[in-house]
Amino acid sequence: MANTVKVTLIKSVSGRIPNHKLCVKGLGLRRIGHTVEVQDTPENRGMINKAYYMLRVEG
């Protein structure tokens, strides 16, 4: 089974670059403080790296 990463949205997506908003949505994050556990895949890492300034990553 693949490793997982916990991702938390810590800043608002309001007024951000549209592609970065889509990355946050693609990770399954909906509101500030919302945490999800996603698989550690290159696709998810790419979305995390693109919107890193709005996220907290653990694991």
UniProtKB/Swiss-Prot annotation:
Family to which this protein belongs: Belongs to the universal ribosomal protein uL30 family.
Any one GO cellular component localisation term in the record: cytosolic large ribosomal subunit
GO-annotated biological processes: translation
Assembly and binders: Part of the 50S ribosomal subunit.
Keywords in alphabetical order: Ribonucleoprotein, Ribosomal protein
GO molecular function, one term: structural constituent of ribosome
Identification of the protein by name: Large ribosomal subunit protein uL30
InterPro entries associated with the record: Ribo_uL30_ferredoxin-like_sf, Ribosomal_uL30_bac-type, Ribosomal_uL30_ferredoxin-like
SUPFAM superfamilies named among the record's database cross-references: Ribosomal protein L30p/L7e
Keyword Ribosomal protein: yes
Transmembrane segments: none
Coiled coil: none
Source organism of this protein record: Stutzerimonas stutzeri (strain A1501)
Short name of any one Pfam family annotated for the protein: Ribosomal_L30
